[in-house]
């Protein structure tokens, strides 16, 4: 389809179209990038025209105006100032847009006619490397997807961090899970039909010609890029689908970046079996770094992230979204955290890191030769910290910390080079001068002396000329247009010496030049120009020198990032009273006094800790209790404890013993998915189906209120069937919260001649009059009432409606007769209670107190109970 800009170019109004020279130049540049916004440099602004202008005005909320006409039609125009363009560019990139930047080539003042322009840079959401366009604590990823009969190949690159990885998955569900995990900023797919629904309408999707996603051509591209004869060293020789995706990605990067990418030195194959699998729904339900409502506050990452550096923050996010199953790796991380805590070294590391910049991304800019002067000073200061960090790690008894100590390396020569070459506080831009330190280069120092001494020369000259001419008001000055001058007022101009040559006439003064001043001007201006040229040459030399050290420096940055994460784990463990988890090879999941890390962090009152005990003969807990009683919190906290243990962190529990876990799967509530045309019940069943098809005996499954999206009997039947399937077919660890009390009978049934593997637990509440206090304590056995009407009253339902509901409940329970299980026999417990004439009603505090067993309480539990009792008074 022809773009509007092309139509504008081809308009024919009353005869042959003749565009202005400027518009011809614009259309020539735009024709090479029809799908990108074109930033067209015109003096101090980047201008956009036609469709680009209309789109930019809408997205950036800038003024849409006109710039005369061309080809017989008005020219829509919008623009952004050059000095502030990065902010606008960042907003466009965040919205999934790509931009081609067309610069003026050469000096416009010297151009004869139209100044030459050329596209010098392409910025896309997945290829940005500029600091101003990046989220410092989140990876910016470019991903490509290819597909075959066997499944999908994925390749993704973090150009700002220098990472390049691939993977293959066998289903649409697995593809969606990977995209949810990685959250690419830009996604390349073949321009074909029948792509999964979740990709349609996604920001940043780029459709590319299908022939670019070819395994053979991808292999050739990778071999040429890495200068290899085979790919066996990368482990992708037998991964044609992943190779096709990698080739498509690499081709796109080379096409858009227009330069070599020396910082991409390898490609890694991710092994799915090394990590705990979590689908998109699980990540959403557990609110790892984003809440269901889109808010990023009060999430697990928000509580856990105590990293000091941006690169440490990005690594933590990667770990959080890919918990490992590799026990040896995790044990080493736990041991490293323990060593940092026991020695107190975590505080020393974190204090040292406060002066550490984002070395990972700085090294990328060095490799791409786009590093700015202050990148050099930040790298210099970071390398200067290494001796101190190495001395902190040296005595610690931790295999992982000793490995990191070795990976830091010794970069004394590089540090010395930067210390001697880079000014203490360099300017923002190389063109400002003063980047290279005094004493580093004798020629540069001499040129600078000429410039520096200029001020004193001008003062001396002014005094001499005043004395020789007798004109006390004579001044020596400089402007960028006319250069150096001697200025004499109009009234004194007749006294100007004969050797003065008039340079400029002003309203109230005349300006002159002398041979001496002209000679000085040539010398000084030449010195300044030569000084900047010399400085640029030295700057390029620094880039060359650092380029030879990139591999070692990247390893160093990686070690610093991991050390930052581990020291952050140590700080969190001490600040939040977390404990070191124990990873067992036998199947079990035992958590003593576990807490929800996020809920505990945001609430003012002490959190009620709870236990969990699952093993081979006890694989499912049916959890009952009142709404708002804490069932969902209890389930989530156990999943989060398992997840934290598998990234190397300590956990919010007094003890956690965890056997092998391969998946965490959840079905915890959902709003209507109207955007995809799915009702709550449809979402519920789709997520349940996924769990039933994928859960294994090593999976942890959370099921919350299955069957609530349909009729009572349908819902009960489905909940019963799902619970039985999970317990007897999947045989996974399951926390099954339900409002169907009939399901509590499952624990009493036998299966295949043995125990059911199902146990009942409940959360209770204490009611006094119209008050209801949730105890949040998990106890053995089923609940005996739901407190639904009391919760409705707490939610603000009108009293008349609650009273009517109580009456109706009594009628329904009486009509139900003996049809329900004996344990859940109908009663009028939710009806108002009539106390005897001489019987004083017990208080909520009394009832809670009677439920306590002082002999079973630890001092901390007793204190927590005291807080709860006080709240009841």
What are these regions (language model features)?
Residues 50-53, 239, 308, 318-319, ...:
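ATPase nucleotide-binding head domains, primarily ABC-like/P-loop NTPase cores
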Residues 506, 510-544:
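Extended, charged coiled-coil "arm/hinge" scaffolds of SMC/Rad50-like chromosome-maintenance ATPases
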Residues 842-873:
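C-terminal tails and terminal domains of large nucleic-acid-associated
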Residues 19-23, 39, 50, 79-89, ...:
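Amphipathic alpha-helical transducer elements in NTP-driven molecular machines
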Residues 26, 43, 92, 103, ...:
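Residue-level signature of catalytic and energy-coupling elements of molecular machines
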């Amino acid at each position: 389809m022809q773009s509007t800009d092309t139509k504008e170019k081809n308009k024919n109004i009353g005869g042959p179209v003749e565009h202005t020279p400027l518009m011809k130049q614009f259309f020539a540049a735009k024709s090479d990038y029809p799908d990108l916004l074109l930033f067209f440099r015109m003096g101090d602004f980047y201008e956009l025209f036609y469709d680009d202008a209309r789109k930019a005005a809408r997205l950036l909320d800038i003024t849409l105006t006109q710039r005369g006409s061309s080809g017989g039609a008005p020219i829509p125009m919008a623009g952004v100032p050059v000095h502030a363009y990065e902010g606008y560019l960042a907003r466009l990139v965040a919205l999934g847009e790509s931009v081609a930047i067309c610069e003026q080539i050469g000096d416009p003042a010297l151009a004869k006619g139209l100044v030459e322009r050329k596209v010098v840079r392409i910025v896309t959401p997945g290829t940005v490397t500029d600091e101003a366009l990046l989220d410092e604590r989140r990876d910016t990823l470019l991903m490509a997807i290819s597909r075959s009969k066997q499944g999908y190949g994925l390749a993704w690159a973090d150009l700002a961090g220098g990472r390049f990885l691939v993977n293959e998955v066998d289903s649409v569900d697995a593809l969606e899970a990977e995209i949810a995990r990685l959250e690419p900023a830009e996604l390349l797919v073949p321009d074909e039909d029948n792509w999964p629904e979740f990709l349609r309408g996604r920001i940043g999707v780029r459709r590319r010609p299908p022939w670019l996603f070819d395994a053979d051509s991808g292999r050739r591209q990778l071999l040429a890029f890495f200068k290899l004869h085979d790919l066996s060293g990368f482990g992708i020789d037998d991964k044609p689908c992943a190779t096709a995706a990698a080739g498509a990605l690499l081709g796109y990067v080379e096409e858009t970046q227009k330069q070599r990418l020396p910082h991409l030195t390898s490609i890694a194959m991710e092994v799915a079996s090394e990590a705990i699998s979590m689908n998109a729904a699980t990540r959403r339900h557990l609110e790892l770094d984003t809440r269901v409502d889109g808010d990023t506050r009060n999430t697990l990452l928000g509580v856990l992230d105590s990293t000091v550096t941006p690169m440490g923050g990005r690594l933590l996010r990667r770990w959080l979204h890919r918990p490992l199953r590799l026990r040896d790796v995790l044990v080493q991380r736990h041991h490293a955290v323990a060593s940092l805590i026991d020695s107190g070294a975590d505080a020393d590391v974190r204090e040292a890191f406060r002066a550490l910049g984002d070395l990972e991304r700085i090294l990328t800019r060095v490799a791409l030769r786009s590093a700015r002067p202050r990148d050099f000073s930040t790298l210099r200061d970071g390398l200067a910290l290494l001796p101190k960090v190495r001395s902190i790690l040296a005595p610690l008894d931790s295999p992982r910390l000793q490995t990191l100590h070795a990976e830091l390396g010794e970069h004394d020569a590089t540090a010395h080079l930067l210390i001697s070459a880079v000014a203490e506080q360099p300017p923002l831009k190389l063109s400002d001068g003063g980047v290279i330190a005094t004493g580093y280069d004798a020629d540069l120092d001499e040129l600078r002396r000429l410039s520096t001494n200029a001020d004193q020369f001008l003062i001396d000259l002014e005094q001499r000329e005043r004395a020789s001419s007798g004109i006390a008001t004579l001044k020596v000055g400089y402007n960028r247009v006319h250069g150096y001058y001697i200025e004499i007022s109009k009234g004194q101009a007749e006294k100007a010496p004969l050797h003065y040559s008039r340079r400029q006439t002003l309203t109230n003064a005349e300006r002159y030049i002398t041979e001496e001043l002209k000679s000085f001007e040539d010398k000084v201006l030449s010195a300044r120009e030569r000084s900047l040229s010399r400085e640029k040459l030295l700057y390029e030399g620094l880039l060359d020198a650092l380029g030879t050290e990139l591999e070692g420096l990247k390893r160093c940055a990686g070690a610093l990032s991991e050390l930052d994460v581990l020291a952050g784990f140590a700080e969190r463990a001490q600040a939040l009273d977390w404990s070191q988890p124990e990873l067992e090879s036998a199947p079990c999941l035992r958590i003593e006094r576990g807490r929800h890390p996020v809920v505990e962090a945001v609430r003012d009152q002490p959190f009620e800790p709870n236990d969990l005990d699952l093993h081979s003969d006890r694989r499912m807990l049916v959890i009952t209790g009142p709404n708002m009683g804490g069932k969902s919190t209890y389930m989530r906290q156990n999943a989060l404890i398992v997840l934290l243990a598998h990234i190397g962190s300590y956990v919010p529990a007094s003890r956690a013993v965890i056997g092998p876990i391969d998946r965490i799967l959840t079905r915890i509530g959902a709003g209507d998915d109207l955007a995809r045309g799915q009702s709550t019940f449809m979402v519920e069943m789709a997520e349940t189906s996924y769990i039933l098809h994928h859960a294994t005996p090593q999976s942890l499954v959370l099921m919350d209120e299955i069957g609530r999206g349909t009729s009572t009997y349908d819902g009960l039947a489905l909940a019963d069937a799902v619970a039985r399937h999970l317990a007897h077919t999947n045989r996974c660890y399951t926390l099954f919260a339900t409002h169907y009390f009939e399901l509590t009978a499952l624990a009493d049934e036998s299966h295949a001649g043995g125990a059911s593997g199902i146990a009942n637990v409940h959360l209770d509440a204490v009611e006094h009059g119209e008050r209801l206090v949730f105890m949040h304590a998990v106890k053995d056995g089923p609940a005996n009432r739901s407190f639904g009407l009391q919760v409705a009253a707490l939610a603000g339902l009108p009293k008349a409606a609650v009273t009517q509901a109580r009456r109706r409940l009594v009628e329904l329970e009486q009509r139900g007769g003996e049809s329900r299980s004996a344990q859940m026999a109908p009663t009028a417990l939710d009806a108002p209670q009539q106390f005897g004439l001489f019987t004083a009603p017990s208080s909520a505090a009394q009832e809670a107190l009677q439920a306590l067993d002082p002999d079973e309480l630890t001092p901390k539990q007793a204190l927590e109970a005291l807080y709860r009792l006080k709240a009841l008074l």
